[in-house]
Amino acid sequence: MQETGVHNGAYGTDKFGLKNLKGVYWNFGAPQLYEHALKNGEAVLSSDGALVADTGVFTGRSPKDKFTVRDATTENTMWWGGNQSITAEQFETLYQDFLKHAEGMTLFAQDLYGGADPTFRIKTRVYTELAWHSLFIRTLLRRPERAELENFVPELTLIDLPSFRADPKRHGCRSENVVAIDFARKIVLIGGTQYAGEMKKSVFTTLNYYLPEKGVLPMHCSANVGPNGDTAIFFGLSGTGKTTLSADPNRTLIGDDEHGWGKDGVFNFEGGCYAKCIKLSAENEPEIYAASTRFGAVLENVVLGEIDRKPDFDDGSKTENTRSAYPLESIPNASLTGRAGQPKNVVMLAADAFGVMPPIAKLTPAQAMYHFLSGYTAKVAGTERGVTEPTPEFSTCFGSPFLPRDPSVYGNMLRELIAKHNVDCWLVNTGWTGGIYGTGHRMPIKVTRALLTAALDGSLRNVEFRTDPYFGFAVPTALPGVPSEILDPVKTWADKAAFDTTARKLVGMFQKNFAKFEAQVDAEVRAAAPDVKMAAE
């Protein structure tokens, strides 16, 4: 077997059970991985120097194909209401079949950290069949120094083989595509898909399992910090604006998607960003555009000009879920430490497909826990297979597919941290205004940015608020530079009766969804629920 690159020779492929490999490329950097991806026909080069790959059939995550081993370790610690199980025996069969499938292959291996805080990070080794997948995960996780690689012993190991085809009868899964996690052995198996985001989210899922026991709240959020050291957290599902809104030229970016919140503050799990880039433009998102049109960026399913090879970010013919992965260093004002102090503001982003939520509202701590557990948004086109237009969705903790433990574990931790650090909480609608999806229009990003700036710099504390008659939270009545009518959603609708009907419908959906949590929360949180009786008064 031919091995090239820096690694710990005493802890190689044999420790994972890999044998009869043709070769291993260890910890290659971007230039080498570009060369292999291009030589192997895995990807092409854009005119700007980005590496552009197609992910084939799977252009998004496939949550129904994700499984966790149910054993003595997980029986009473996993949230089985939200996770699918396989037996330890089925996983072992799958694992051995993965090892057999890898024989004769040349694999790419990366030794990386999941987490910027040395106390809580997890040492992660990722074996990939494809060179561009190796570049992707190297970009998204945190890269050790060269000297650290020579003694690196992984705690978590992923193997990613897109050419593997699972057998549902033999392996206990649903289809030929599979993501299987064994928390006791700290192994993740990914097969049958070329969608690179499965790797990143598998590491996130493992951190979501291990960190609460260490007193750290893992979060599906972005984070940034202002010039005065004021940290802000942005919760939200894919496509709601986490990446876009946290990339603020006046604030330092900590990270765009995954963080932990513990005794010393907030830390990024990652070393890169993974931005949706459909309709990406230099005018609306200059930093993300610049990071996506340069050497080192990995573009997924982006259409290139036939002759000039220029990315056409407006073309969603392959998928609406076009993506750009780039290192944090590509953002001019990104924090390279990936760490910041205790948050002063928590923002919950919702893409309201009904168009009845205000562009911003202030939440009490109880309302914050209610909306965190509710996790309301719209599923935005393309993030998952089969979703082509926004549909209302409740995804608890703004990340249901990635929660191994019961949502109340994360909800209670958030409430305690908000109270302990006296954090201001906001709900921001980045969805629709002027009508329901299809008749209204998307909230202007400039309005959202202006309102967020006012919230984060403290100026929103000094304005007059009204109580929303449907949702009960506090809504500003006026703010300089923002049209006052957009602050009150009913004023943006031509048909006021239709607004009332739609708002009541959404309130009912909130109540129906939250019923499953009522036994796990106290009276104060239950009282924070939206209530149609308010609207009738």
Curated annotation (Swiss-Prot):
The UniProt annotation places substrate binding at R61, Y195, K201, R323
Cite a single Pfam family from the UniProt record.
PEPCK_ATP
Per the record, GO CC terms? Answer: cytosol
The terms under GO molecular function for this entry are: ATP binding; metal ion binding; phosphoenolpyruvate carboxykinase (ATP) activity
Annotated compartments = Cytoplasm
* Gene Ontology BP annotations: gluconeogenesis
InterPro entries for the chain:
PEP_carboxykinase_ATP, PEP_carboxykinase_C, PEP_carboxykinase_N, PEPCK_ATP_CS
Family annotation (PANTHER family):
PHOSPHOENOLPYRUVATE CARBOXYKINASE (ATP), PHOSPHOENOLPYRUVATE CARBOXYKINASE ATP
Its function, per the record, reads:
Involved in the gluconeogenesis. Catalyzes the conversion of oxaloacetate (OAA) to phosphoenolpyruvate (PEP) through direct phosphoryl transfer between the nucleoside triphosphate and OAA.
Put simply, this protein is called Phosphoenolpyruvate carboxykinase (ATP)
Species in which this protein is naturally found = Rhodopseudomonas palustris (strain TIE-1)
Gene name? pckA
